[in-house]
């Protein structure tokens, strides 16, 4: 049984002093996650949220529909000139994200600290 996707936004500051929006996802990411994934991202003020981190550390499962939502988010970010990095993926999902080409749009990191430093 799929668990509901939760998403919340936190504001951090990069080592260079720039504002960073962190989207923290929790639960499973699937076709029913559109509002949590895309809705939360689209609600970010694009003029302020130039740097975005995606936190997958509390995500249990991502199916193919969920991966498609993440790709859509990344394409929208690229079209808006936003820089995105992701962290907290399991080894399996790091491999899957790499295989489907997500790394063309977002660098993948093990920890928030590594991702924040890279932005």
Task: Describe the function of each predicted region.
Residues 5, 11-12, 73, 83, ...:
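Intrinsic disorder/low-complexity segments enriched in polar/small residues
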Residues 91, 113-114:
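Acidic phosphotransfer microenvironment of two-component signaling modules
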Residues 1-24:
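Short beta-strand/loop segment at the start of cytosolic alpha/beta domains
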Residues 115-119:
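A short, charged, amphipathic alpha-helix used as a generic interaction element across diverse proteins
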Residues 107-111:
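Short acidic-hydrophobic, aromatic-tinged amphipathic segments that line or gate anion-handling sites
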Residues 34, 112-113:
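Residues at or immediately preceding the N-termini of alpha-helices
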Residues 28-106:
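Amphipathic alpha-helical interaction surfaces in cytosolic regulatory modules
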């Amino acid at each position: 049984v799929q668990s509901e996707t939760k998403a919340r936004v936190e504001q951090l500051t990069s080592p260079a002093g720039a504002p960073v929006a962190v989207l923290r996802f929790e639960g499973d990411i699937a076709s029913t996650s559109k509002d949590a994934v895309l809705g939360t991202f689209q609600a970010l003020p694009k003029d302020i949220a130039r740097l975005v981190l995606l936190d997958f550390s509390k995500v249990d499962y991502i199916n193919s529909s969920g991966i498609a939502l993440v790709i859509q988010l990344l394409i929208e970010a690229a079209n808006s000139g936003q820089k995105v990095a992701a962290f907290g993926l399991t080894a399996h999902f790091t491999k899957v994200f790499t295989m489907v080409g997500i790394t063309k749009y977002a660098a993948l990191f093990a920890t928030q600290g590594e991702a924040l430093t890279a932005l």
